[in-house]
Amino acid sequence: MEYFKNVPKVQYEGPKSNNPYAFKFYNPDEIIDGKPLKEHLRFAVAYWHTFTGTGTDPFGASTMQRPWDRFSDPMDIAKARVEAAFEFFEKLDVPFFCFHDRDIAPEGDNLRETNKNLGTIVAMIKDYLKTSKAKVLWGTANLFSHPRYVHGAATSCNADVFAYAAAQVKKALEITKELGGQNYVFWGGREGYETLLNTDTELELDNLARFLHMAVEYAKEIGFEGQLLIEPKPKEPTKHQYDFDAAHVYAFLKKYGLDKYFKLNIEVNHATLAGHEFQHELRYARINNILGSIDANMRDMLLGWDTDQFPTDIRMTTLAMYEVIKMGGFDKGGLNFDAKVRRASFEPEDLFIAHIAGMDAFAKGFKVAYRLVKDGVFDKFIEERYKSYKEGIGAEIVSGRANFKTLEEYALNNPKIENKSGKQELLESILNQYLFTE
């Protein structure tokens, strides 16, 4: 069965094309810095938003028109989604996809039945992977949707829930390895608290660390060679989540001796919910060598929640790819579109249009960022701005030879301090020049 009959294979046609099913800026085989653009960007489709999203919200029922919804049996729907997914990957020519365990197979009446369902669908996906160009960027376990996780998973007050979550992650690690996944993600949507009045914060954080250490050990035991990732988010669905932002996660990893095993999967919306620009989170992760992968989307800044819109802001994508290029590019990570079409964009064709828009936005952003890095636009200014640390008292500070006494003596004998302009407006103007010209 063909699920997307109205959509041809998506091709690159250039910026003057009016074809909604064509790339305008993303030419996957375009060589930049000795490597095809598709290898720089490593795009991935999010299985959950694309194939299981219904369009429901707190005020209304589902709106999405999906051809696989004609089935009633959950396993029949799951099988149809696999067929539709690989047709989608092929037509979009996307190299990767990501999934939660509960995205690909329905939960059964008990853990054994659930794992049996997973086994059936994983076998089906494996067959498709034999002939498909698409690969698994990362897998993960859904430890937030089922009512058992009302108090959390690894941080639950109920040890039975901790045990169930461990069993679920064990299976998710196994199937991610079986499907050739290059990463495994932990996102603690329920790992946090609503009120401190009933929370043993120390025990919860200690238990979260114990859980992650167990995961590390099991990944080693089964020979999983992918990168383990943690995805920060400050809130939603939980009022206060322990993986608040990149700095919080890094401090947690350092405290519990986990920093050598984990990197971060940074999402745009999660950064802004934490009160940061996306580039801030990427920069912090990059300079601490913990930037692993990206969940690409965009937030409506007039709304107070995680809107998961497809990214179309070229300035944002440019500054994001600037950090990725400065890092040396992705290793095992990539750009996963953790984004959903709007509730009113309910036709199956909208899934392609949305992904094309996001892929074009990041392709354009990458090209602009590459020119910025190559020309040293910001590097030259920053080097000049901090040149006082290259010689004299600045060099003494950086080398560790200075102390409070020597610095006081210097300050007493150097009463005149001269600062220079930060030139923010000039730099923003230069950025605009690069954005609006080839």
Swiss-Prot record:
<feature type="binding site">
    <location>
        <position position="267"/>
    </location>
    <ligand>
        <name>Mg(2+) 1</name>
    </ligand>
</feature>
<keyword id="KW-0460">Magnesium</keyword>
<dbReference type="InterPro" id="IPR036237">
    <property type="entry name" value="Xyl_isomerase-like_sf"/>
</dbReference>
<feature type="binding site">
    <location>
        <position position="270"/>
    </location>
    <ligand>
        <name>Mg(2+) 2</name>
    </ligand>
</feature>
<keyword id="KW-0963">Cytoplasm</keyword>
<dbReference type="GO" id="GO:0009045">
    <property type="term" value="F:xylose isomerase activity"/>
</dbReference>
<dbReference type="Pfam" id="PF01261">
    <property type="entry name" value="AP_endonuc_2"/>
</dbReference>
<dbReference type="InterPro" id="IPR013022">
    <property type="entry name" value="Xyl_isomerase-like_TIM-brl"/>
</dbReference>
<dbReference type="InterPro" id="IPR001998">
    <property type="entry name" value="Xylose_isomerase"/>
</dbReference>
<feature type="active site">
    <location>
        <position position="103"/>
    </location>
</feature>
<protein>
    <recommendedName>
        <fullName>Xylose isomerase</fullName>
        <ecNumber>5.3.1.5</ecNumber>
    </recommendedName>
</protein>
<feature type="binding site">
    <location>
        <position position="267"/>
    </location>
    <ligand>
        <name>Mg(2+) 2</name>
    </ligand>
</feature>
<keyword id="KW-0859">Xylose metabolism</keyword>
<dbReference type="GO" id="GO:0005737">
    <property type="term" value="C:cytoplasm"/>
</dbReference>
<dbReference type="GO" id="GO:0000287">
    <property type="term" value="F:magnesium ion binding"/>
</dbReference>
<feature type="binding site">
    <location>
        <position position="338"/>
    </location>
    <ligand>
        <name>Mg(2+) 1</name>
    </ligand>
</feature>
<feature type="binding site">
    <location>
        <position position="231"/>
    </location>
    <ligand>
        <name>Mg(2+) 1</name>
    </ligand>
</feature>
<keyword id="KW-0413">Isomerase</keyword>
<keyword id="KW-0119">Carbohydrate metabolism</keyword>
<dbReference type="GO" id="GO:0042732">
    <property type="term" value="P:D-xylose metabolic process"/>
</dbReference>
<keyword id="KW-0479">Metal-binding</keyword>
<comment type="similarity">
    <text>Belongs to the xylose isomerase family.</text>
</comment>
<comment type="subunit">
    <text>Homotetramer.</text>
</comment>
<dbReference type="InterPro" id="IPR013452">
    <property type="entry name" value="Xylose_isom_bac"/>
</dbReference>
<feature type="active site">
    <location>
        <position position="100"/>
    </location>
</feature>
<feature type="binding site">
    <location>
        <position position="308"/>
    </location>
    <ligand>
        <name>Mg(2+) 2</name>
    </ligand>
</feature>
<feature type="binding site">
    <location>
        <position position="306"/>
    </location>
    <ligand>
        <name>Mg(2+) 2</name>
    </ligand>
</feature>
<feature type="binding site">
    <location>
        <position position="295"/>
    </location>
    <ligand>
        <name>Mg(2+) 1</name>
    </ligand>
</feature>
